[in-house]
């Protein structure tokens, strides 16, 4: 009987299985192949329709292959989708509406549109949150607190995101937090 209680106690102390990251039916899935591994992302088409349509158009246009994760801040974000390996900025379509008011939060593993201080300046660049970043959430209507529009989440490959988030960085061509060895986006494909 005491062995039963010992085993029961050990079972109760065991960590719970990881929460399932199953995508919602109908949400688009995109696979990002990088020089460090593959990241699979679910896109929130209902909560962020403008951002998702914009991102998917860049995917369908073949815009992202050859771009790099040009900004890596450990414990914060990895950002990419706008510069080539030599840090040449790619030409983009016009900026889109900022959907930061959609109620989605910048939690670990979420994907959001990058922008400048101008509220409607997001084009092709996006970032993945390495940790919860409430300072990036919408809390008001001035540029400092308007927030960054979350439009998806990583459902596979967060280990790859974390490895990218741990690369050595420095300054290059007037930009900070640039990986010393380029981390290249090799392909981005729409899975569904």
Map each language-model feature to its residues.
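Sec-dependent signal peptide recognition
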Residues: 1-9
């Amino acid at each position: 009987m005491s062995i039963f209680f010992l085993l029961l106690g050990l079972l109760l102390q065991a960590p719970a299985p990881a929460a399932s990251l199953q995508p919602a039916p109908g949400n688009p899935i995109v696979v990002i192949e990088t020089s460090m591994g593959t990241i699979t992302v679910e896109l929130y088409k209902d909560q962020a329709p403008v951002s998702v349509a914009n991102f998917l158009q860049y995917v369908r246009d073949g815009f992202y292959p050859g771009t790099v994760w040009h900004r890596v801040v450990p414990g914060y974000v990895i950002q990419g989708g706008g510069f080539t390996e030599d840090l040449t900025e790619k030409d983009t379509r016009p900026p889109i509406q900022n959907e930061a008011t959609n109620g989605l939060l910048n939690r670990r593993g979420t994907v959001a549109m990058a922008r400048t201080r101008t509220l409607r300046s997001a084009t092709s660049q996006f970032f993945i949150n390495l940790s919860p970043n409430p300072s990036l959430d919408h809390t008001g209507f001035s540029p400092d607190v308007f927030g960054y529009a979350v439009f998806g989440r990583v459902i596979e490959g967060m280990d790859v995101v974390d490895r990218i988030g741990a690369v050595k960085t420095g300054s290059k061509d007037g930009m900070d937090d640039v990986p010393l060895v380029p981390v290249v986006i090799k392909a981005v494909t729409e899975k569904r």
